[in-house]
């Protein structure tokens, strides 16, 4: 009797435990089916859906007249889906033949157990079409876009290029990434439990949105004129490089920017001017590529030499420490403290007025007026003119001015600064600063970007840039235009003169560091018309061989450019 009671209690405990377990399972099932159903439906959907990206077309870059400078070509991405492959050996053989890849690499990817494995990107469309037409099970051919530059080397360091993911790496391509890149779309396909895509099942598709078009101030024809002139002097003078920049001094729009030698934007990882028989490490190759991609107009600094006398003269006229009628004596040198600083004319210029001093590019004259101005005021004008700030050009990697601290500027430093030595600036900084001194006295922002457009050319928005007034007075600016016109017509800039045109400018010949290397930089800054400048250009020739004077070799380059550009811009002869 006692055993029966015990067994009955035991059975009841088991029964209640079973009821509790079943209730808990039932409750959990109800919760999953009703309250958490959406979550598990999503998991199930994700398990049987495969997402593939549809690449968005990158926006084009067009010049001021709508000439396409950067666009896209259709290419293909070849992938394999392991679970769908029926004949691996055939797939491997075909892909090796069509793609020109090593069998070991192809086999490794084909045999890898994964939902989808990329074999190769940026495959030419013709090749992709051939592979697609073979209808190989497990092989996917998706269309993609590759950046294409119709003019190869044209403005290479300005336009820049994109990487394998079609994102900008240098130049305008990276600066305007947010404008140019589009929004990728997606394709969702349904698969069975083995990961095989189901046929005749509707795909969920989100269409890509193409990037916007960037219109820039560069003019295709003006750029070509500048490229031809720069290449010619580069070859004739066997120079290390030549830079040419043309801009509108009234609004900062850049018409042309050339840096020779240019590289091919469609093959940006191929080095130029390199002996193929010379072996390099990967690090050396990368360093050489980095140097090839540099834009000397904005990335590299140099001692401006006598073109800086434009800035010294402007500061001294504005401050009132010199007048046009002041007279000076040049014996061919000036003694400053314990230094004998020479003029380029060894025998000296003798007695001369300030006007003659700037025409003759006389160092002693500029030493004298620089010392009159003094270090603190000179430094203040450096700031006022914007020389100690970046120009904020819309290209990445702009270098800043390399200048002494004001407390470190002694009399010798002040003397050499006055004629453009012992500090360094970029060509774009020189062009921008001189623009502000001849345009009436306001500083512009040099730039390429003009407008963002729809694909059909409809304007979305104009790009705006800052201007800073009060750089110098209109009177000082007018005086500088007159002085610099006289330099071209009567002084050291005569080789920049074009009959019938009014041109102002200044030449320079500066020595690079270390001085013992005997390497020079020849340059010329010129603008036209002198009375109302509409175009300003700077030419910088690095390490020319033979004759290296700026007035002899740099001024003629800008003259040859202006021979074509001034009529092209509608600037008529007087």
Cite the ranges covered by each PLM segment.
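Periplasmic/cell-envelope proteins involved in peptidoglycan metabolism and beta-lactam response
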Residues: 1-277, 301, 376-388, 496-497, ...
């Amino acid at each position: 009797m006692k055993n029966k009671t015990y067994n009955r209690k035991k059975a009841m405990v088991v029964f209640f435990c079973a009821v509790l377990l079943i209730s808990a399972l039932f409750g959990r099932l109800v919760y999953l089916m009703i309250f958490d159903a959406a979550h598990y439906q999503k998991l199930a959907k994700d398990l049987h859906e495969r997402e593939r990206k549809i690449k968005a077309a990158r926006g084009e870059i067009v010049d001021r007249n709508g000439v396409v400078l950067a666009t896209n070509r259709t290419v293909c991405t070849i992938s394999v889906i392991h679970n769908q492959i029926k004949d691996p050996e055939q797939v491997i053989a075909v892909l090796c033949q069509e793609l020109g890849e090593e069998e070991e690499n192809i086999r490794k990817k084909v045999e890898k157990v994964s939902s989808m494995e990329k074999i190769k990107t940026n495959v030419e469309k013709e090749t992709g079409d051939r592979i697609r037409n073979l209808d190989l099970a497990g092989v996917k051919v998706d269309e993609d876009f590759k950046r294409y530059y119709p003019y190869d080397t044209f403005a290479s360091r300005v336009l820049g290029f994109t990487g394998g993911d079609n994102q900008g790496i240098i130049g305008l391509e990276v600066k305007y990434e947010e404008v140019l890149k589009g929004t990728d779309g997606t394709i969702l396909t349904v698969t069975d439990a083995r990961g095989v895509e189901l046929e005749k099942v509707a795909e969920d598709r989100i269409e890509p949105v193409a990037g916007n078009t960037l219109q820039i101030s560069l003019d295709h024809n003006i750029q070509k004129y500048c490229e031809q002139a720069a290449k010619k002097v580069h070859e004739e003078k066997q120079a290390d490089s030549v830079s040419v920049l043309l801009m509108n001094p009234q609004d900062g729009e850049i018409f042309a920017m050339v840096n020779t030698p240019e590289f091919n934007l469609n093959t940006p990882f191929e080095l130029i001017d390199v002996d193929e028989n010379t072996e390099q490490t990967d690090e050396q190759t990368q360093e050489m590529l980095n140097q090839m991609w540099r834009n000397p107009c904005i990335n590299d600094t140099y001692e401006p030499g006598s073109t800086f006398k434009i800035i010294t003269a402007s500061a001294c006229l504005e401050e009132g420490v010199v007048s046009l009628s002041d007279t000076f004596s040049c014996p061919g040198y000036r003694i400053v403290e314990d230094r004998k600083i020479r003029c380029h004319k060894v025998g000296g210029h003798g007695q001369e007025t300030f006007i003659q001093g700037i025409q003759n590019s006389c160092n002693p004259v500029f030493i004298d007026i620089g010392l009159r101005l003094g270090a603190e005021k000179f430094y203040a004008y450096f700031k006022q003119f914007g020389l100690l700030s970046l120009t904020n050009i819309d290209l990445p990697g702009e270098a800043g001015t390399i200048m002494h601290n004001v407390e470190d500027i002694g009399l010798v430093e002040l003397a050499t600064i006055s004629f453009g030595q012992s500090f360094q600036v970029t060509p774009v900084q020189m062009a921008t600063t001189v623009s502000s001194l001849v345009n009436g006295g306001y500083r512009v922002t040099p730039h390429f970007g003009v407008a963002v457009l729809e694909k059909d050319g409809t304007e979305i928005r104009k790009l705006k840039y800052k201007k800073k007034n009060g750089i110098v007075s209109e009177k000082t600016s007018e005086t500088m235009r007159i002085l610099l016109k006289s330099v071209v017509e009567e002084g050291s800039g005569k080789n920049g003169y074009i009959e019938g045109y009014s041109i102002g400018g200044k030449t320079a010949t500066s020595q690079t560091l270390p001085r013992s290397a005997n390497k020079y930089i020849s340059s010329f800054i010129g603008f036209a018309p002198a009375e109302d400048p509409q175009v300003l250009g700077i030419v910088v020739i690095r390490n020319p061989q033979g004759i290296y004077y700026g007035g002899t070799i740099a001024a003629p380059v800008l003259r040859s450019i202006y021979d074509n550009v001034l009529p092209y811009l509608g600037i008529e002869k007087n």
